[in-house]
Amino acid sequence: MKSESVSGANVPPRARQRNDRDLSDCVRVLTEVHEHDGYPVNWPDLPGAWLTPPSLIASWVAELDGRIAGHIGLSRSGVEDAAPGLWSTRAGTSIDATAVVNRLFVAPWARGHGIGALLMARAVTEAQARGLHPVLDVVASDTAATALYERLGWQLLATVEQQWSPEQKVAVRCYAAAT
């Protein structure tokens, strides 16, 4: 997608694989997103480690005007993920046949340039190239994210309640990429 960048130049955003040098910029952008939108709901003690979980398959960043403007990850399913089990039951496949799209965020200053859709397309392409079906969980109150997923044709599998801590229950919408 070609659009006018924040500097006023017509420069398309681009997605590329994240590297170790990007991590501090990703944490900075995540901090901006958390302050602006409250994502993630619970700020991690170690945000760099949160962006690099042991289950991570791959991750990408989006750049706009030469700056990190967004991030997305693709992971193997974990016990905390509801969508893989819902999809595998519906499709009659193993949970291992899914990949979880996660850690998607776009800097507030970079929104409106198609970066979320660009990153989603990159993660979906990678999952499918690995023979995996992309799924995701999103906090039900994150209406901007759910609007993006539905606009991209993702299918709502269910809304479930997750117990994130003894005092915190959260409604989560579970999606699967269109087949």
Regions inferred by a protein language model and the residue ranges of each:
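Conserved acyl-donor/pantetheine-binding loop and adjacent beta-alpha core of acyl/acetyltransferases
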Residues: 73-103, 163-168
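Conserved GNAT acetyl-CoA-binding A-motif
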Residues: 127-139
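A short beta-loop-alpha structural element at the N-terminal edge
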Residues: 12-28
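Short hydrophobic/aromatic beta-strand element in the GNAT-like acyltransferase core
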Residues: 57-61, 71, 103, 135, ...
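Glycine-rich phosphate/pyrophosphate-binding loop shared by adenosine-nucleotide-utilizing enzymes
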Residues: 11-13, 66-71, 99
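Conserved acetyl-CoA-binding loop-helix of GNAT-fold acetyltransferases
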Residues: 103-106, 112-125, 147-151
